[in-house]
A protein has these predicted regions:
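Acidic/His-rich structured neighborhood in mature extracellular/periplasmic domains
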Residues: 78-215
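N-terminal mature-domain "stem" immediately C-terminal to a signal peptide or N-terminal signal-anchor/transmembrane
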Residues: 35-91, 95-96
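Glycine- and aspartate-rich repeat motifs characteristic of hemolysin/RTX-like Ca2+-binding segments
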Residues: 313-366, 371-375, 381-386, 400, ...
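Pan-zinc metallopeptidase signature
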Residues: 245-323, 348, 366-367
Length: 411
């Protein structure tokens, strides 16, 4: 497995971790949980608990290093893709990391390489792929000594949290980048046997082409050229190039105004429109594997108050990212609201009173108790739902999902 390495001047800037290989046994590993269908509304309720668990005793070395919690994504072959969570990383961060991993492994119908990702997920599990979430920030030479892709707490945001909402560049969200590195290395296949060798060949060739014509590897820093050569020596150009495209495609550099482009200016395109015009080849490769919208459930930080929007609003820079979300859930007990976008959203409130506006599309609000526990009243152009979760006002919502059935609204 490729351990990401970089020159000192860029290691922290790019969020690339460096670690020693783990000497643990490569014996077959059993899953600790069952595989749930993320497209089923019931999964939202089922995953309120049980996703993050105590680290199993068989991972004694991880436990010794403070990785006291564990999660996993179960591949179709029944084997786990493991996630180890160190003390100091929140459950919210770990849950989001798991959701992002599952999103990358979700089938994308009609795409050349992503229509059936079961072989990619199975390869990851067979390769005993692991994601580790250490506390704090990366420090060169102090990485936990495990054969696992690192993603540090200081580079993980959660929707609704202050780092996400304020686009805090001191805590630039590297979640998509680092988790896709794991999918790329252990699933698509680079230094380990993978499921999509032709895709990897195309990605590697395009990375070299992008360097050659100035789309990627732009020398905004004196160390970039050395970093690119280091990546070339370790055969990691493809991984870093497509990760840059992914970050800009899903809005993670849309609010960055310190330099043109994305990834601190190393990549030519800042947002999806710029990718289409400045790097159409990169766009084609990304869309050969990943969908245009992010379909994982965004579970908002429990501290969030106000209205979280899935619709782009130039006055709210965080919506460069949230505009590509489809499903969002409020957590905790603070008064907060949700606004959907033009897609078919699945939205869920918390234990407070919430206003949920679905916007365009066919939108569903999720409640985790039986329908008999709620009172539904339609008044003018909204619907009021009162029950164990408080009293919610619903606008432009077409369906309400309950634990025991669904109600179709007519407004």
């Amino acid at each position: 497995m490729r351990r990401a390495r970089s020159i000192a001047s860029l290691c922290g800037l790019l969020g690339i971790g460096c670690s020693e290989p783990d000497s643990s046994s490569k014996a077959p590993i059993a899953a600790e949980s069952e595989m749930l269908n993320p497209s089923d509304p019931a999964t939202s309720c089922a995953e309120d608990s049980g996703v993050i668990m105590a680290t199993p005793e068989r991972y004694a070395r991880y436990r010794e290093w403070g990785f006291n919690r564990y999660a996993e994504v179960v591949a179709p072959n029944g084997k786990p893709i493991r996630i180890f969570v160190q003390e100091g990383v929140t459950d919210h961060q770990a849950h989001r990391a798991r959701n992002v991993l599952r999103f990358f492994l979700s089938d994308f119908a009609g795409s050349p390489y992503g229509a059936d990702k079961s072989a990619v997920a199975n390869a990851m599990a067979d390769n005993q792929a692991a994601l580790m979430l250490p506390a704090g920030a990366h420090e060169e030479g102090n990485e936990p000594p495990f054969d696992a892709q690192p993603l540090y707490a200081a580079e993980m945001t959660v929707e609704g949290g202050p780092w996400y909402q304020n686009n805090n560049w001191e805590h630039r969200d590297a979640t998509f980048e680092e988790i896709f590195h794991l999918v790329h290395d252990a699933g698509i296949g680079t230094h380990m046997p993978g499921a999509l060798p032709d895709f990897q060949i195309a990605l590697r060739a395009e990375a070299e082409a992008a360097i050659g014509d100035g789309r990627w590897g732009i020398p905004v820093d004196s160390g970039v050229t050395d970093w690119i050569e280091e990546l070339r020596r370790e055969d990691s150009l493809a991984q870093e190039y497509i990760a840059s495209v992914i970050d800009s495609y899903y809005g993670y550099w849309g609010a960055f105004d310190d330099a043109p482009g994305g990834m601190w200016g190393i990549y030519i395109a800042k947002n999806r429109a710029e990718i289409a015009s400045l790097d159409p080849a990169g766009l084609a490769l990304l869309e050969a594997f990943l969908p245009s919208m992010v379909n994982y459930e965004a579970r908002l930080d429990k501290r969030f108050t106000g209205t979280f929007s899935l619709a782009f609003d130039p006055s709210e820079p965080y919506t460069h990212k949230s505009q590509y979300l489809i499903n969002a859930t409020l957590t905790g007990s603070n008064a907060a609201n949700l606004t959907g976008n033009a897609f078919d959203n699945r939205l869920r409130g918390n234990t407070s009173d919430n206003t949920i506006d679905g916007g365009q599309g066919t939108d569903t609000v999720i409640y985790c108790h039986p329908a008999a526990d709620y009172t539904i009243t339609t008044v003018e152009d909204w619907t009021t739902v009162t029950g164990p979760d408080g009293t919610d006002r619903l606008f432009d919502i077409e369906r309400i999902w309950f634990h025991d059935g669904e109600v179709v609204l007519t407004q």
